Amino acid sequence: MVLKSYAKINLSLSINRKLSNGLHEIQSIYCLVDLYDSITIKKNKKEVIDDISFTGTHSKHISKLNNSVRKSLNLLRKNGLITDYYSVRINKKIPVFAGFGGGSSNAVSLINYLTKNKINKNFFDKMNNELGSDLRLFYHNRGFLKNLKTIKKINKSYNLYFLLAYPSIKCSTKEVYSKVKKYTKKQDYLNKNFKKKDDFINYLKNCKNDLQSIVEKKYPKIKNLLKDISDRKGCYFSRMTGSGSACYGVFSNENSSKAALKKLRKKYP
């Protein structure tokens, strides 16, 4: 069986406060994009062990012993949801340490497949506590993360054209969040009434990623890349996703995004 494990991007990301456990409460409008890892999975009938390997451009920085796939399989067995062991091959097309959530997406894709999309709230909470709080994002193609435990699905869909850029910088999520000093007041996205795509785009233009200025300060290359993207014809706005370092631009149409990509590839070979 081959699974597609999609990347996410944060269309907005606001840091609301720091919790007593050291985590930060955030809000985010997000969506999944057409960038994915391919996961090939089959039962390992010869050995009582999981055989996990990663291939592809972005595989070399992933630990074979300490990764989201292995942790997911162990958690499923620990909770009696599976008993078998598996051979899993992941072709990594999603950059790591980039803000795309590739590891979390891999975990959710695997868990959904092995449980046939049937998990109870108790396991769902364990999964998010032990594997990562952003796993819940991958249960909707798009949504509004209201707080660390609540996601509101966005039912209305718009055709958005993205240019994705990875500047080959590995950002530490822990380090980036440790430098947060200012907080943004909570908002309720669902109170907004967007009658058409332009209204939604204009709203997003006025949003931001609170972590972006922190990362730009350490890596000026990211600030320059974002400006290069936003200066391209047809670009509504550019932004960093998650805690970086990946950036994106939202374009008015596919041709504009492809033309921008062609020019950026010449500047950033």
Language-model segments: residues:
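ATP-binding N-lobe of GHMP and related small-molecule kinases
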Residues: 1-98, 116-122, 166-169
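Conserved, helical-rich catalytic subdomain that frames metal- and/or nucleotide-binding sites
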Residues: 50-54, 138-237, 252-265
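Phosphate-handling active-site elements
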Residues: 78-87, 113-131, 253-264
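Short secondary-structure junctions
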Residues: 79-84, 231-235, 266-269
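DPxDG-like acidic metal-binding loop motif
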Residues: 98-124, 137
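Glycine-rich beta-strand-to-loop/alpha-helix junction loops that act as flexible
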Residues: 100-103, 240-245
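Short hydrophobic/aromatic beta-strand micro-patches
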Residues: 248-250
